[in-house]
């Protein structure tokens, strides 16, 4: 288990670097006169796929956001299932602290956003934008502190982020679903039933689940619910345990996907969506209720919610601090959780899917600026509270 956590952290740290590079490239390409037009043409390039009579025609940007991101959510589904069955969320005692922290880290940012936007019926639909945490960026910053970071603090952050991702998935399903096309929803229900049947029959071939998953993705895409949810559903049904000692299909697929997601899908998503055209940006609008609400949610709501609910859960005796971790370290890492970036941008695109380009631009700017500041403040806070290297808690051998 410790070995798996180390591998995950190392991969996410490298992914964080890739994300930063992709973001810088996107901003450069979108604003440099030599590449700006080509960048937009690349994203708007039409891509058509046919499956018999079925035709799906979208531009490249939407294929990245609806198609490739479904693979990212498949990985999340696999990770959540593993943690729930045999990982850091497998028991009530283990799960309570990160669960409480994650709930606080979603509710409080939304409340802070609404403080600025509750009276604006156009912008208040973005209340969930600051509720997300970008685990790759957060882990990337955490690893800059090396062996000073206790293993228990890393596990806490990973568990919190996994629950946070699950919360974001539920928010997308419940609050950002457009008009339902019922025949397609019926097809999605049948596809889920087929996945359940495969699981119950203990089918071990991952390809069988993925084929049904493609059908599910198409049905969900057509019915009006966001298609990326298909990935999570498929991940939950792929078997984790085997009775005859064979390799776990879920763990095998998870390991196979991690590199592709970390080094291709998420950086490509960042490259496609972080290219904000800075020309024409009005400073007054940068301090609009939308941008300020996002910044307040990420920079104040996140750490406040995580800290308060963590303290309350420990105080009431429902959980205890991880071994070798002080409460000041929980407070410091809560600041780091204000890095919203990819998931916050993803929810922005859903919240303002009507196509208001100006709202999306200023929301993205708020996310980028707040996430960058959260990364800096979180790093400085952790550097101040973590033990010096010679006194650091040594990681467990695994």
From Swiss-Prot:
Q: Family, per the entry?
A: Belongs to the NhaA Na(+)/H(+) (TC 2.A.33) antiporter family.
Query: Does this UniProt record's set of keywords contain Chloroplast?
Result: no
**Keyword field contains Ribonucleoprotein:** no
One Gene Ontology MF term? sodium:proton antiporter activity
Record localization: Cell inner membrane
List the membrane topology term(s).
Multi-pass membrane protein
Stretches that traverse the bilayer = 14-34, 60-80, 96-116, 125-145, 155-175, 179-199, 214-234, 263-283, 292-312, 330-350, 362-382
- Signal peptide positions (record): none
Q: Write out the GO cellular component annotations.
A: plasma membrane
Task: Give the UniProt keywords, A-Z.
Answer: Antiport, Cell inner membrane, Cell membrane, Ion transport, Membrane, Sodium, Sodium transport, Transmembrane, Transmembrane helix, Transport
Q: What role does it play?
A: Na(+)/H(+) antiporter that extrudes sodium in exchange for external protons.
What is the organism lineage in this UniProt record? Bacteria, Pseudomonadati, Pseudomonadota, Gammaproteobacteria, Enterobacterales
Q: What is this protein called?
A: Na(+)/H(+) antiporter NhaA
Reaction it catalyzes: Na(+)(in) + 2 H(+)(out) = Na(+)(out) + 2 H(+)(in)
- List, in alphabetical order, the GO biological process terms annotated in this UniProt record: regulation of pH
